[in-house]
Amino acid sequence: MSTATGFSRIFSGVQPTSDSLHLGNALGAITQWVALQYDHPDEYEAFFCVVDLHAITIAQDPETLWRRTLVTAAQYLALGIDPGRAVVFVQSHVPAHTQLAWVLGCFTGFGQASRMTQFKDKALRQGADSTTVGLFTYPVLQAADVLAYDTDLVPVGEDQRQHLELARDLAQRFNSRFPDTFVVPDMFIPKMAAKIYDLADPTSKMSKSASSDAGLINLLDDPALSVKKIRAAVTDSEREIRYDPEVKPGVSNLLNIQSAVTGVDVDTLVQRYVGHGYGDLKKDTAEAVVEFVSPIKDRVDELMADLTELEVVLAVGAQRAQDVAGKTMQRVYDRLGFLPQRG
């Protein structure tokens, strides 16, 4: 089956579990979403969600979660997501996500769910007493997020491939019993997605789950702090600036970062730094990053100072999302034989 709009649908989202998105989020994901809006406006209908329901698989302070949900949405807009071209909304504003998650949970084998790698890793770290059923069923909710919108393409990293495979499997399993219910989504990998690594551990990708904040370039950090972090970035004991991720991961990461925020290709940058030291590379990278993030931070500050614009965007987005996901739920409920509500 295909969507009635004729567009390919895309769904993606970010958890509101930090006070700021980091440069890896921006360059590895969200700027790619932005590019889709403008490069292929007649091909894709995009749904970009703040996935707050996923956030509560670990304990959250209510006021902090409320603020982080808004600031995450604000960063979507500040990075260039256009609510006139894409649907921007908050997951908990659309009941279909949890409704569909329950249905899909009834089609998910316990063994299949227990084999999800991220659950096993987190359960091992947290211990049985701290591991919730919500964390266990997290991938099923992810599948519901995707399938509720008849999603064709899901921009995901390698670490989420297993969860997307679950969504595909559940769609196919349901369709085998109730044909033509779900679109089976495919993985979407942008051609030029930047891979940004931790400044303090350049063999690990930049992630908000890192043990230390020292390696993260947060979009909303004070510029002076970003400069300090980049100047302290791990490099190596050599002096030559060349691109070699295996041998020189730290230097290569700085080159990637500078290339991503300036648009200058890495080979050109390497030629510029012939005869220069790591200090020059760090200085220039820091300046380029500050120039990139400063207008983003300014726009977020503006949106958060007066929430009217942001709240309207999220309300309109939730209505559009509910219109689409509600039709999916009606189709699912009809297939299952649930009694329709009358009146």
UniProtKB/Swiss-Prot annotation:
A motif ('KMSKS' region) lies at residues 205-209. Homodimer. GO terms for biological process: tryptophanyl-tRNA aminoacylation. The keyword Protein biosynthesis applies. L-tryptophan binds at residue 145. Catalyzes the attachment of tryptophan to tRNA(Trp). Pfam families: tRNA-synt_1b (PF00579). A motif ('HIGH' region) lies at residues 16-25. It is found in: Cytoplasm. Belongs to the class-I aminoacyl-tRNA synthetase family. The lineage of its organism: Bacteria, Bacillati, Actinomycetota, Actinomycetes, Mycobacteriales. It catalyses: tRNA(Trp) + L-tryptophan + ATP = L-tryptophyl-tRNA(Trp) + AMP + diphosphate + H(+). ATP binds at residues 15-17, 24-25, 157-159, 196, 205-209. It comes from Mycobacterium leprae (strain TN). GO terms for molecular function: ATP binding; tryptophan-tRNA ligase activity. InterPro entries: aa-tRNA-synth_I_CS, aa-tRNA-synth_Ic, Rossmann-like_a/b/a_fold, Trp-tRNA-ligase, Trp-tRNA-ligase_bac-type, Trp-tRNA_synthetase. GO terms for cellular component: cytosol. PANTHER family: TRYPTOPHAN--TRNA LIGASE, MITOCHONDRIAL (PTHR43766:SF1). This is Tryptophan--tRNA ligase. Its EC number is 6.1.1.2. Keywords: Aminoacyl-tRNA synthetase, ATP-binding, Cytoplasm, Ligase, Nucleotide-binding, Protein biosynthesis.
